[in-house]
Amino acid sequence: MILSEAILNCKNYIDTEEIIHLIFAKRNNGKFLPDSEALVLELTPEEMEMQLSIIAETKCPGFEYFLEFFVLQDFYDDLLKIEEFKSDDKKVGRIIYYAEFDA
């Protein structure tokens, strides 16, 4: 899966009391990009207490934490209301920027 697919399909992942969904992705030349390789991890609340870097090292070496799905879904919903972000490319770009610099 690539990062843009994970972002645009964010509504397909529903967190529960037992499972929390997170995206981990690989950087290309030091940056997250729409075509960066991405993984969706399902973690238990106990696993969420671990440092994210340790989760990445043990469950997906070479990948870095990107965002939790509940954060992504809230931000995605907000973007749907803004005319400037109607295209998928604009939504993906803004979410990547948010994950890199604002989250």
Regions found by a protein language model. Name each.
Residues L39-E100:
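Amphipathic protein-protein interaction modules
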Residues M1-I55:
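Extended, charge-biased low-complexity segments
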